[in-house]
């Protein structure tokens, strides 16, 4: 057998073995949601005025969105100058900087303002997934 064919078989074996492992660990919607929540919590640990416990109320003042994009674009703005009471300004800043860094604008500032203290968790979750996809390989 040629070495090329041998390498192809080795690669196929790796794929087959990895699929056996992944099939043993079934991902369901709740485990995916929990994993993304943990990813965000780890990235935002230590940010003032940011406490991530869910994909709804934790994001209502815009500070979490600002912290998340600031984590990956720290030179874009001074996080310390932000005020949780300035919701509109926080959303505008976070969404603008996120878009400049490759995150699709899936949320609208006016919608977030209208949702008040309890944004739709599915909307926030979907938007935060975009951050994960864009920045998952960053330390």
Predicted regions and their residues:
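Long, intrinsically disordered low-complexity tracts enriched in Pro/Ser with mixed acidic/basic residues
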Residues: 1-58, 67-139
